[in-house]
Design a protein with these regions (language model features):
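Active-site-proximal structural scaffolding
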Residues: 13, 162-163, 171, 200, ...
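Generic recognition of flexible, low-complexity loop/linker segments
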Residues: 7, 17, 155-158, 165-167, ...
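Carbohydrate-binding surfaces of carbohydrate-active enzymes
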Residues: 4-21, 263, 298-303, 417-426, ...
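Aromatic- and carboxylate-enriched substrate-binding clefts and catalytic-loop regions
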Residues: 35, 92-93, 265-547, 585-586
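Short, glycine-/Ser/Thr-/acidic-enriched flexible segments
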Residues: 35, 174-176, 183-185, 214, ...
Length: 658
């Protein structure tokens, strides 16, 4: 049965009800359920703006038109989507005999919208789409630790892990974007025959589909539908210093003083984890941080902001555990002991999906940090990280982990964003280790997690950062040098560090962090002092030659402050990525769709990172239609060609578009 009601097409067959409706200009939202009522959650989507929509119902089916997008559904329930030129962009993969007039009718009985019942009332949902073009390229989808920018052929887990962030918005070279608007754990396969999305426990199929002429327009329309980042504050434009971990107040202050003695630019310095007595206390340990107010005043006098690490984990011995347990503010386990992460104590995470738990945490943070003058937070463990990722074992206020777990980093960011906003703060940014669709509107700056210190890892981060931008997360960064290991006295690591530092200069936020070797002696025996501290990780820790290169690139970053501010304005207003694939800026240049190891920092600078050890040459493609100035020497090149540059350790190829 097909009908028009409340500005949408409604299709009903057996237990399934399906809605097709406009959701912004040139975009539609499609939902289906086998429950008695359609779930009302919007998840990543903001409320829809009203747009002109034409709906037509005929003997053969129904059609909805909205600007550049046309959606058709047959009487048999099959959906197809076209652009304004009549090009087929999406076709559901039905293989049955419900409609014998369908050219693809078949006896193999495969459903495009398969709701397989789970015990307890949810469904294991599979949506199948026909792969229409063997040359299609697909981008976005968040952050995965792999070198592939083009995801066609990829098999991706729709779940968060430390260094993996599922942000399920895909951009296609065919001229569309698709948001899988379901925060449940699942899987997507961008196959050459079938594109399939799965949710392992859900009540509804829900996706949003946009048609536009360029990747930039797709991204901007998506940003209107899901929100944009705030304006980046001034301290987000420069250099951030961090390591695992400064153990005392005096140690951290002495590092900041040394930066100032050397006349080096420094915007933010970081107090890392285990500055607290117990996980879940959310306060400074007075044995090692005796006067945070005085520390913050001294840093402010140096024009340096202090960022403090917050973990969502709560130790059984924390002063807040019993109250949070009694009030239902902790994530639950379906079986076994209530432990999610076994690291420096058996801990469980606060339940960010519970509004009262969000309020409780913020009040603790406000009293112990914010009211002292700390206005930027490092929200670690945001996936949340589990010692065992048994997604079927955790239950939140809003549902099971399998059903809604990917929403956690959004609600974690929201906890702080709304708390800070209520205090009158504007231009809010907080650093998180994970994101889902919509995280950007809560001031989430995502970093790529606990990654290896290797050239292979660095290559993976380049792909991850570009795909995160295309997935709608323009604020993104990495640990310069990688996280795990790396000895500042090792020549091989120094080379990696230099190459990563050069690249980090042209990332949205330039942030130095890592767990360097060898580990340092433990300072103290109580509270957070039980946690380790890595070797020195300041720019002068790597020898004089490396130091000179670091200073050069820190000053380059400073000189670009005005330009970077402009890019942040574009991200705030339109949702534009800071790091952009070549095809984002040059969609008509076919070669740009093939390049995966270069990118644009905004619209002006082409960046060609050095991604291997021992490199003395770099092959670079310069997009067609403009001229390019090599920033190191001023030489001018015509676009539309490959060039080979000789490279030395003290410089990375950068070209200015002229």
């Amino acid at each position: 049965m097909l009908k028009q009601e409340n500005g949408r097409i409604i299709y009903h067959y057996d237990a399934e009800e399906l809605w097709i409706e406009s959701w912004g200009k040139n975009a539609v939202r499609i939902r289906a359920t086998k429950n008695a009522e359609m779930p009302k959650d919007n998840w990543a989507l903001l409320s829809a703006e009203e747009v002109e929509t034409q709906i037509e119902i005929t003997e053969d089916g129904a059609t909805l038109r909205n600007g550049k997008v046309k959606v058709s559904i047959s009487n048999g329930g099959k959906i197809t989507i076209y652009n304004q030129k009549g090009k087929l962009l999406l076709e559901e993969y039905w293989r049955n005999r419900r409609d014998l007039r369908d050219s693809k009718c078949s006896a193999i009985e495969v459903e495009a919208r398969e709701f397989r019942p789970n015990v307890g009332g949810d469904y294991h949902l599979t949506m199948r789409l026909q792969s229409l073009d063997k040359n299609e390229k697909i981008y976005g989808m968040g952050q995965y630790q792999q070198p592939y920018l083009n995801l066609k052929g990829a098999d991706l887990e729709l779940a968060h892990r430390n260094s993996q962030a599922s942000v399920p918005f895909a951009i296609s070279s065919m001229g569309y974007g698709l948001l899988w608007n379901n925060p449940g754990v699942g899987r997507v396969v961008f196959g050459n025959n079938i594109i399939s999305y799965e949710s392992y426990a859900t009540k509804v199929l829900d996706y949003w589909f946009v048609v536009e002429d360029t990747p930039a327009k797709i991204e901007e329309t998506y940003a209107k539908a899901t929100g944009t980042v705030p304006m980046m504050p001034e301290y987000g434009l420069g250099f951030w210093q961090c390591k695992l971990r400064y153990q005392t107040q005096e140690e951290l202050l002495e590092i900041a003083r040394e930066y100032k003695r050397r006349n080096l630019p420094l915007d933010v310095i970081v107090v890392d984890f285990f500055h607290w007595p117990k996980q879940g206390d959310w306060k400074f340990d007075a044995d090692y941080w005796p006067n945070p107010d005085e520390m913050i005043r001294e840093l402010e006098a140096m024009n340096v902001k202090l960022m403090v690490s917050i973990w969502p984990t709560v130790d059984r011995e924390s002063e807040n555990y019993e109250e949070m347990l009694e009030k239902g503010y902790l994530i639950r386990t379906e079986r076994g002991f209530r432990t999610g992460l076994n690291f420096e104590g058996a801990t469980i995470h606060y339940d960010a999906t519970n509004p009262n738990a969000r309020k409780f945490l913020w009040e603790k943070v406000k009293t112990n940090y914010y009211d002292k003058g700390i206005k930027i937070f490092w929200l670690d463990e945001a996936e949340p990280e589990y010692s065992a990722y048994d997604f079927d074992n955790y239950r939140y206020f809003r549902g099971t982990d399998l059903e809604i777990g990917n929403i956690y980093p959004v609600e974690y960011a929201r906890t702080f964003y709304e708390g800070m906003q209520a205090e009158g703060q504007k231009n809010i940014v907080n650093l998180l280790r994970c994101a889902w669709a919509g995280s950007q509107r809560y001031g989430a700056l995502v970093w790529s997690g606990d990654i290896a210190s290797s050239f292979e890892s660095m290559r993976n981060q380049l792909a991850a950062g570009l795909n995160m931008g295309l997935a709608g997360i323009p604020w993104w960064t990495t640990d310069i040098g990688g996280f795990h290991g790396g000895d500042p006295n090792d020549p091989a690591f120094r080379e990696l560090f230099v190459r990563w530092f050069q690249w980090g200069t042209f990332c949205p936020v330039m942030r130095l962090h890592g767990d360097r070797e060898p580990r340092q002696p433990q300072y103290g025996t109580t509270g957070g002092a039980h946690c380790c501290s890595g070797a020195a990780n300041e720019v002068w820790s790597y020898g004089e030659d490396v130091y000179k290169i670091c200073v050069k690139y820190m000053n380059i970053r400073e000189k670009m402050r005005g330009y970077t501010r402009k890019l942040m304005e574009e991200a705030h207003i339109k949702g534009t990525p800071i790091m952009r694939t070549l095809f984002y800026e040059f969609p008509e240049d076919k070669e740009c769709w093939e390049i995966e190891d270069e990118y644009m920092y905004g619209d002006k600078y082409l960046i060609a990172p050095i991604l291997e050890a021992g490199v003395n040459e770099r092959r670079i493609y310069l997009p067609v239609g403009v001229q390019w100035k090599e920033c190191n020497c001023g030489r001018i090149y015509y676009g539309g060609q490959y060039i080979t540059l000789t490279v030395s350790l003290d410089s990375m190829p950068v070209f200015e578009r002229i």
